[in-house]
Amino acid sequence: IGAYTVDYNGSTLTFLDTPGHAIFTEMRARGADVTDIVVLVVAANDGIMPQTREAIAHSKAAGKTIIVAINKCDLPAADPVKTKSGLMEEGLVPTDFGGDVECVEVSALTGAGIDDLLGLLVLQSEVLELQANPKANCRASIIEARVEPGTGSSATAIVESGTIRVGMPFICGPYAGKVRALVNDHGERVKKVGPGMPVEITGFSETPNVGDELVEMENERAAKKLGEERQEELRKQRLAQPRKARMEELLAMMGDGTQKAQLKILLKGDVQGSVEAIRKAV
């Protein structure tokens, strides 16, 4: 998932860019969970695809407002009306068809309609009264994680409430940490980042899992104590799972009288999201 900000008429919009390929299902689901407004990009020459239906389902399940960007309207084969008809079959009725779903015809190639889309996003955010308290206890959602040579584990996160600061103790999943450095979406080192903004964080004791929530703690001691408690709970769960799995495998082999060969695979990728997608494909 890519995260970046766009300034438009005095407002700052944060975009989460999720891949459209079929194997990136989990990424799209996480994107729908974290975001406030879903921009559903549909190609005017392709219409409704399986991934489109999936993205609509994720967005509806997360209870998010959907704005449809009908892209590639510059192509001769573009048919926005047919695309809108397809959206109606999925339960999304465009405003010009008497519904409440805003649709904007755009072209990523020529830039046509992009201003209209950005303006609509700003307007919708005002209608929804999207607000966050920068003075609240900091919470951030991990949208990508990796191990960087020389800096160790780092993660990209969206700050959902409060303000994340360098030196802040936190808990993320089962591990405690302390913010060592913050880098904004322009690659600049910063001291703090407020709500709704993407940020790259270093200072994790272990690589966090995508989807984990980072929560500000009162001090490092409290973070470490909570981390140890969560790790112990995970250890107990891991010890219980193998015995159950072995019993299920044994019963399965006894049932059909055959023993199936198992091929163990070690997957490595640049970020957790890539590994997740490859695992799904395999």
Label the predicted regions:
Residues A43-A44, I67-D79, V104-A112, A145, ...:
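G-domain G4 guanine-recognition motif of GTPases
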Residues A61, P149-V282:
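C-terminal effector/interaction modules appended to NTPase cores
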Residues S11, F24, M49, E89-G99, ...:
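Active-site phosphate-binding and catalytic loops of NTP-dependent enzymes
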Residues D74-K135, E200, V215:
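Canonical P-loop GTPase G-domain recognition
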Residues S11-T12, A22, D33-R53, A61-V81, ...:
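Conserved Switch II/interswitch segment of TRAFAC-class P-loop GTPases
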Residues M49-P50, L75-K82, A112-D116, V179, ...:
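Switch/connector loops and helix/strand junctions flanking conserved nucleotide-binding motifs
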Residues I1-I37, A44, H58-K60, E144-A145, ...:
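Switch I (G2) and immediately adjacent beta-strands of P-loop GTPase domains
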Residues F15-D17, V39, T52, S59, ...:
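Residue-level signature of catalytic and energy-coupling elements of molecular machines
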